[in-house]
């Protein structure tokens, strides 16, 4: 399902963007092509292959947390879309959604410190995406875990050093992501 980009999370993010745009602008010129692309990718067979890949040897940390967070964001977008085809896609995506959420739930209790980089591994940005999904799905356990970890990691933070951002490799602001979360 998620191929054709430099990395897996970019493909997932691209699918989220297609869903968001097609849901937000159903009569736009691009909507039919976006829906066709989603229909090609979000099949039960394709998603089963993705789940199998994730469960492969040596992939326990695959796309954690950034890619898994975007996967959950895609699932939330499909759930928010009042459309029969989107409901089919959400159902097809469900096994990968469950696998992604379970991986986050298993990982976070072991993570003693936040990851404050301006890159994919950053926790605050991923937490924001995961929180949105948890709120949309009513996953109280995930909300509680994120709330606990967020308070543990960030509650005492003051005066984030914005003058040092961005660094030479950042594409996310650790300070702004933390404030957003």
Positions of the model-derived regions?
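Extended ligand-binding groove/face enriched in aromatic
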Residues: 4, 10-12, 19-134
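Loop-centered beta-sheet repeat module
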Residues: 100-176
């Amino acid at each position: 399902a998620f191929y054709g980009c430099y990395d897996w999370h970019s493909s997932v993010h691209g699918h989220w963007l297609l869903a968001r745009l097609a849901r937000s602008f159903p009569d736009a010129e691009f909507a039919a092509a976006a829906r066709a692309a989603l229909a090609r990718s979000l099949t039960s067979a394709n998603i089963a292959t993705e789940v199998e890949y994730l469960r492969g040897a040596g992939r326990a940390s695959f796309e954690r947390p950034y890619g898994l967070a975007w996967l959950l964001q895609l699932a939330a977008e499909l759930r928010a879309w009042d459309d029969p085809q989107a409901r089919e896609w959400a159902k097809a995506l469900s096994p990968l959604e469950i696998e992604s959420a379970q991986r986050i739930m298993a990982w976070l209790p072991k993570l003693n410190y936040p990851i404050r980089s301006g890159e994919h591994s950053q926790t605050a940005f991923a937490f924001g995406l995961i929180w949105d999904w948890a709120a949309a799905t009513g996953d109280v356990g995930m909300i509680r875990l994120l709330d606990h970890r967020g308070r543990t990691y960030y509650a005492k933070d003051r005066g984030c050093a914005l003058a040092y951002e961005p660094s030479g490799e950042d594409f996310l602001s650790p300070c702004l992501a933390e404030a957003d979360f």
